């Protein structure tokens, strides 16, 4: 049986992003984001209700301050009492898991979308995704960028403006571009 492009995307395989089913999911997420981002002056409780409508899993007390941007939403799982400040971006072609009690500063970008090295595959519109896992009680400073396939361990700290290109051990403090373990 042949897999659909969406099934390939969700399995982390090479897929064609121009596929009509995938494009329909992008449009649906765009409509949800338009409504969510118009709730800027609403309460955290109202935001939480909207998040449960548009994201895959939302733990109790989780907050994402608008404006917020993502590709699909259904690949995002945010734990209990996790907090994400405004202007964050999650490119969620693969699963993004944010653990309980994690705090994410403004303008953080989390990418799961990746592209093949082969220029012909890129020109054909092929891409793939690699999941990002962020543990419990992690602090990610404003403007940090988390690249595809990265796992950040529980209780880790990522400095503002850091570019995280590889896994971060539990309890580690990383900063810089590329991010490196510091003191």
From Swiss-Prot:
It is an enzyme of class 2 (transferase). GO terms for cellular component: cytosol. Pfam families: Hexapep, Mac. One of its GO terms (molecular function) is O-acyltransferase activity. Its EC number is 2.3.1.-. It comes from the Bacteria. Keywords: Acyltransferase, Nodulation, Plasmid, Repeat, Transferase. The keyword Repeat applies. Acetyltransferase implicated in the O-acetylation of Nod factors. Belongs to the transferase hexapeptide repeat family. This is Nodulation protein L.
């Amino acid at each position: 049986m042949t897999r659909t492009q969406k099934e390939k995307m969700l399995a982390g395989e090479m897929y064609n992003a121009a596929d009509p089913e995938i494009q329909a999911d992008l449009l649906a997420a765009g409509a949800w984001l338009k409504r969510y981002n118009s709730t800027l002056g609403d309460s955290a409780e109202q935001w939480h209700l909207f998040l449960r409508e548009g994201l895959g899993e939302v733990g109790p007390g989780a907050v994402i301050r608008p404006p917020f941007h993502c590709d699909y939403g259904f690949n995002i799982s945010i734990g209990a009492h996790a907090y994400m400040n405004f202007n964050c971006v999650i490119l969620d072609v693969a699963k993004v898991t944010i653990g309980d009690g994690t705090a994410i500063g403004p303008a953080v970008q989390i990418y799961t979308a990746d592209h093949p090295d082969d220029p012909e595959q890129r020109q054909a519109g092929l891409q793939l995704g690699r999941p990002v896992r962020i543990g419990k009680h992690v602090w990610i400073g404003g403007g940090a960028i988390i690249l595809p396939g990265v796992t950040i361990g529980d209780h880790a700290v990522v400095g503002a403006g850091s570019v995280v290109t590889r896994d971060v051990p539990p309890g580690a403090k990383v900063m810089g571009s590329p991010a490196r373990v510091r003191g």
